[in-house]
Amino acid sequence: MMNWNTLISAKRFGLEEFHQERHENRSEFQRDYDRLVFSAPFRRLQNKTQVFPLPGSIFVHNRLTHSLEVSCVGRSLGTDVAKAILARQPELQNSYLPEIGSIVSAACLAHDLGNPPFGHSGERAISTFFSEGKGMALKEQLPAAQWEDLTHFEGNANAFRLLTHQFEGRRKGGFVLTYSTLASIVKYPFSSSLAGKKSKFGFFTTEEESFRRIAEELGMKRLNDDPLKYARHPLVYLVEAADDICYQMMDIEDAHKLKILTTGETQDLLLSYFPEERKAHMLKTLDFVSDVNEQIAYPVSYTHLRAHETLMNLV
């Protein structure tokens, strides 16, 4: 059984021996968020597409704007989940549990950092380079587990490496984020040998011990030793939910901006999420809005709320 008292830790990866609580204007988890925002890998997301190619004069979402929006939704979900847990377990009020919103927000900001250009197509291109292309020349020089990592390249595992690996000339611990933020981005807490047909896994062989250290410190449930596999950190589900809410809504909004969908088709898609009474109220409000983009932005924001309400009813 996992325990909230251990699952949320402000200990920083790579700075464990210097761990201390600072009583300043930001919590440790807000520091994680700020550290990511000001980083070069985060800025690089602006040139990575979300779904549609970057068309220039029409501003559709890219990975950077998507990550910012996911972090906002994640913060709201995390804050509400923390309130729900505290209502049932008030003894956790003086723990780090009220910080869940900040942790999820930071993890959401980092969730796409390891994705190559062109998303899943980019992952397949890298994998194919090693499994069928010139990269095959390296096969005999690598252990089987590392070769498996390369022939099933995974953006999520690459994000964990980017955040924790000590690159040439850089400090120990990578971004030196808190253990809880790092654990919250690992959707697939197992190695590539367990990836299966979907080729999904959470860390490369080179970072396996780093993940083990984090998981053991947080008291995450270990499901298997060799190959290594853990149960997810609970906050991963909130990061994943925020990501799903955003990309499904934003893809529809972008399709409208690019004139792939008409205004009527887009409104029908978005309004289908609502009961008839709420839908009638929204249509009445839309009668007062003449700007076409605003006619879509309004139901998009309400659809976020609808998804949020639905999730919170399950807590």
Residue ranges and their predicted role:
Residues 1-25, 37-48, 57, 68, ...:
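Sequence-structural signature of the catalytic-core scaffold of metal-dependent phosphohydrolases
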